[in-house]
From Swiss-Prot:
Quaternary structure annotation from Swiss-Prot or TrEMBL: Forms a cylinder of 14 subunits composed of two heptameric rings stacked back-to-back. Interacts with the co-chaperonin GroES.
PANTHER family tied to this protein: 60 KDA HEAT SHOCK PROTEIN, MITOCHONDRIAL
Gene Ontology CC terms, in alphabetical order: cytoplasm
Record's keyword terms, sorted: ATP-binding, Chaperone, Cytoplasm, Isomerase, Nucleotide-binding
Protein name: Chaperonin GroEL
Annotated Gene3D superfamilies: GroEL, GroEL-like equatorial domain, TCP-1-like chaperonin intermediate domain
Highest rank taxon of the organism: Bacteria
Function: Together with its co-chaperonin GroES, plays an essential role in assisting protein folding. The GroEL-GroES system forms a nano-cage that allows encapsulation of the non-native substrate proteins and provides a physical environment optimized to promote and accelerate protein folding.
Gene Ontology BP, a term: protein refolding
Main location: cytoplasm
């Protein structure tokens, strides 16, 4: 076992704080409408330019192992916020850094870290309740567009496009973001369906960078039982190979020998194929397979209907222009089903929704209806160069996630104003001085996002924050984009509550862990062995020419 380096107390926390600061200082310059770009070197191709906090955080790896631990813990704040809310990663990083810095000072002054953490948790719980209480529900397409615009760093075109997409496929509909082949950014709505099952083996992936399997103009085999042996499938597999088209198998499961054989064939390049578990369970699985069959113009291979695998022909398989399979989801785009049959199926599901008395069944039926009737919206992001397209795509992804979050939990005034106002409303009391100090840490940290946004815009943060707090109106704040004070909600400067809430909760959670750290352990760097000396007995070579 390799030797370890162990650091304790203050020296451990100082190293960790250094790592936190390096990561946060790189990420926080991107915050706000006047946030700066970060350029990331890539091992191949052009450098990447981004304003996406989590993309910057993911690139940072420090040489010093103890500093790196601090940086990676803060990176977790950004990643977790991105996973839950899809946006707000930079805000979360700024909050995390502020809480850790203040907390480290308090611990250095001799305060109890556990009581500090309890105080921080008390304050955060109260602020979250305050934010949810102040949230304004969004109903109109204009409000949706405003949220998208803010999250896309003030680009109104992106906000409007996302609002249009949500209007066309519904709030629960599937919206995907792709790189365009042209310089224009455009929206396309395609009939399609997505379900929450991914590929059964990563070897089916066709795009290793994104870890997705994209199969164009594919056949789709729908089977309601498990496949553990491919013998019965050979006739249909051979028929598909003759057409040179890809095949997607959707079955209860594909296991053992069957899965291994498919993977080997895919790797050898003889068969473009992917296997996916069927969505749902029991009777619901049968119904969802039937939905997919109607959407793709295929048949469910079921022994109940007297169809055996050995007798399957190409015309029993479904067809789709594109099937995209990630680790967790499968999207079927532009299935070959007849419109009349799809409409009949939609009517049937609507009828079932009206008749059912179970809320759970109704919810599941509505999900199926959205999948069948909603379609898939595709936003194709264009730009003059590949670097520009990638940077813009990051912003569109953020804007889309923020918009979904806003529809879910509502909005509050943006620009860090909601947190700034909440800091003045904290009334929680600790049971001792150290818990009070923890509450005060959160009070001060809540000002950090607003201060950073104004600093990035080249303004004096203390003056702006002071002026905002002088006005009692909840929605009064500073619009950094045009340099004016006023009602931020009316001006369209808004943040989704879910994003702000998640950023604060994750920042406080990880910061609390960092403050209460008393020891750190890392592997010592390996010492390179001294190179062996030249063997003796090599004399007598002086007469050779070199």
């Amino acid at each position: 076992m390799a030797a370890k380096d162990v650091k304790f107390g203050r020296s451990a926390r100082e190293k960790m704080l250094r790592g936190v600061d390096i990561l946060a200082d790189a990420v926080k310059v991107t915050l706000g409408p006047k946030g700066r770009n970060v350029v990331i070197d890539k091992s191949f191709g052009a450098p990447r330019i981004t304003k996406d906090g989590v993309s910057v955080a993911k690139e940072i790896e420090l040489e010093d192992k103890f500093e790196n631990m601090g940086a990676q813990m803060l990176r977790e704040v950004a990643s977790k916020t991105n996973d839950t809310a899809g946006d707000g990663t930079t805000t979360a990083t700024v909050l995390g850094q502020a809480i850790v810095q203040e907390g480290a000072k308090a611990v250095a002054a001799g305060m109890n870290p556990m009581d500090l953490k309890r105080g921080i948790d008390l304050a955060v719980t109260e602020v979250v309740a305050e934010l949810l209480g102040k949230a304004k529900k969004i109903n109109t397409s204009e409000e949706v567009a405003q949220v998208g615009t803010i999250s896309a760093n003030g680009e109104a075109e992106i906000g409007k496009m996302i609002a249009d997409a949500m209007q066309k496929v519904g709030n629960e509909g599937v919206i995907t973001v792709e790189e365009a082949k042209t310089a224009e950014t455009e929206l396309e709505v395609v009939e399609g369906m997505q379900f929450d099952r991914g590929y059964l083996s990563p070897y089916f992936v066709t795009n290793p960078e994104k870890m997705v399997a994209d199969l164009e103009d594919a056949y789709i085999l729908l089977h309601e039982k498990k496949l553990s042996n491919l013998q019965a499938l050979l006739p249909v597999l051979e028929a598909v190979v003759q057409t040179s088209k890809p095949l997607v198998i959707i079955a209860e499961d594909v296991e053992g020998e069957a899965l291994a054989t498919l993977v080997v064939n895919k790797l050898r390049g003889g068969l473009k194929i992917a296997a996916v578990k069927a969505p749902g369970f029991g009777d619901r699985r049968k119904a969802m397979l039937e939905d997919i069959a109607i959407l793709t113009g295929g048949q469910v291979i079921s022994e109940d209907l007297g169809i055996k695998l050995e007798t399957v022909t190409l015309d029993m398989l479904g067809r789709a222009k594109k099937v995209s399979i990630s680790k967790e989801n499968t999207t079927i785009v532009d299935g070959a089903g007849q419109k009349a049959e799809i409409d009949a199926r939609v009517s049937q599901i609507k009828q079932q929704i009206e008749e059912t008395s179970s809320d759970y069944d109704r919810e599941k039926l509505q999900e199926r209806l959205a999948k069948l009737a909603g379609g898939v919206a595709v936003i194709r992001v264009g730009g003059a160069t590949e670097v520009e397209v990638k940077e813009k795509k990051d912003r569109v992804d953020d804007a889309l996630n923020a918009t979904r979050a806003a529809v879910e939990e509502g909005i509050v005034a943006g620009g860090g104003t909601a947190l700034l106002r909440a800091s003045a409303k904290i009334s929680a009391k600790g049971i001792n001085a150290d818990q009070e100090a923890g509450i005060n840490i959160v009070r001060r940290a809540l000002q950090a996002p607003a201060r950073q946004i104004t600093t990035n815009a080249g303004e004096e943060a203390s003056v702006i924050v002071g002026k905002i707090l002088e006005n009692a109106s909840e929605t009064y704040g500073y619009n950094t984009a045009n340099g004016e004070f006023g009602d931020l909600i009316k001006a369209g400067v808004v943040d989704p509550v879910k994003v702000v809430r998640t950023a604060l909760q994750n920042a406080a959670s990880v910061a609390g862990l960092l403050i209460t750290t008393e020891a750190m352990i890392a592997e010592l760097p390996k010492k390179d062995a001294a190179p062996a000396g030249m063997p003796g007995g090599m004399g007598g070579m002086g007469g050779m020419d070199f």
